[in-house]
């Protein structure tokens, strides 16, 4: 999520200087050495928007690999690496993990609808003061269309394989499943701002 999911974003090596820059930024932003949920929400500006906060909480949990309710520097680097230059398949697996709210290995219509609604609301928060165009499809219509195109066996659930295959086969599905809230753009903007001071 974040940067657009594309096959070409597959650079995996992290430059040592870049890693040092990330560490300096992490220490400034998180002097305790860990990033807590409330700080993560603040970064995305969603403290007062419950639907958007729900989505950001799921993103946080997906990045919190060891489940200790914090993101340490290694998890932070892994998250940035995924968002900024991860391979398509890794990004899709991570996106699937965010969408699979109950962790059962499948995404049902309710789970997908909750995420799509949260992202619609988050995009409204991110666009405050900008053109607030009404989406062409409602969240329900988006979910129904995704299931029509991706649920190959018709069981009312999307498996990881269906999710990845559906995204690869159909550009519209890819766009809808990535539901880009631009954390990569946000991260780059924060890095630019800090470089100015």
Swiss-Prot record:
Where Ca(2+) 1 is bound, by residue?
64, 66, 68, 70, 75
Q: Where is the lipid attached (N-myristoyl glycine)?
A: 2
* Residues of the EF-hand domain: 15-50, 51-86, 87-122, 138-173
| Tissue specificity comment | Low expression in retina.
Task: Look up the record and give one Gene Ontology term from the biological process aspect.
Answer: visual perception
The UniProt keyword set, sorted, is:
Calcium, Lipoprotein, Metal-binding, Myristate, Repeat, Sensory transduction, Vision
Q: Provide a GO CC annotation, any one.
A: cone photoreceptor outer segment
Any one GO molecular function term = calcium sensitive guanylate cyclase activator activity
S-S bridge residues = none
Q: InterPro entries given for it? A: EF-hand-dom_pair (IPR011992), EF_Hand_1_Ca_BS (IPR018247), EF_hand_dom (IPR002048), Recoverin (IPR028846)
Q: Where is Ca(2+) 3 bound in this sequence?
A: 151, 153, 155, 157, 162
**SMART domains, sorted:** EFh
Q: Which Gene3D superfamilies match?
A: EF-hand
Q: Pfam families under this entry?
A: EF-hand_1, EF-hand_7
Source domain of life: Eukaryota
Query: Where Ca(2+) 2 is bound, by residue?
Result: 100, 102, 104, 106, 111
Q: What else is known?
A: Binds three calcium ions.
Role description = Stimulates guanylyl cyclase 1 (GC1) and GC2 when free calcium ions concentration is low and inhibits guanylyl cyclases when free calcium ions concentration is elevated. This Ca(2+)-sensitive regulation of guanylyl cyclase (GC) is a key event in recovery of the dark state of rod photoreceptors following light exposure.
Put simply, this protein is called: Guanylyl cyclase-activating protein 2
Q: Which species does the entry assign this protein to?
A: Lithobates pipiens
